[in-house]
Amino acid sequence: KINYYAVFLLPPEMLVLFKPNILFLSEHSVDPDKRRYAVPDEGPRHYIDMDHYGTYPYPSVPRKWNEAVAKYGEDSLKKQGIVPWHIQWMLQRLTNAFKTKNYSLIMKYSAEIGHYIADAHVPLHACSNHNGQYTNQRGIHGFWESRVPELLAEKEFDFFIGKAAYIQYPGDFIWNRVLESARAADTVLSTERELSLLFTDDKKYAFEERNARLNDAVGQEKTIRQYSTAFTIAYNKKLGGMVERRMRQSI
């Protein structure tokens, strides 16, 4: 939905190009995720483990790619994730597509850059403990990123936020957003941990029927354990609207 709402922020001169393609932009925003298991270099484009580089605001990390490579080496950087740099490369590709008037690439890169920008706004995409695997909180990544919006976004979140503004220094902008995500990661984890003390497991989790995916039989439903509605609402409230705020900012 991020790409969908982003279209409506565009000036009229761009809206005439993007609005007729709004479904393409929405549907193909997930293409980078689909590539993660087929393209070895895809995974690091979605995250950066900022805690690997010390503490906020991580002054040791060069913001420019060539300087970062000179300091850490390309292999080391890719191991820890490269999302802030990859977004800038995607922006260059998109700019070149506009210059050459290659409309198919304009749509492809527009759809995909929206995905990477959204990832950069997710706190656990800027933290090595990306799914709570180090703190016995496995599943928290999908909880913050999917479960909370799934239950609350359509009815409670406001995604109409005025008109788009030109960003003069996109490199600085995306790094600031990544640093915000890294700073918020501990809150995402600690809030879930604190709230879990107030909920027994039978209240924290619920079993729900979901449509089967991928290798399962088409149309088949499967029962999965999911964070309960009550726990999800309480978590969102305790976070002070962080999920909505980060989603709005990613638009």
Sequence positions of predicted segments:
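Divalent metal-coordination and catalytic microenvironments
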Residues: 115
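N-terminal, motif-rich segments that launch catalysis or mediate targeting to/interaction with membranes
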Residues: 1-108, 112, 126-249
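Short active-site segment of divalent metal-dependent hydrolases/proteases
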Residues: 118, 124
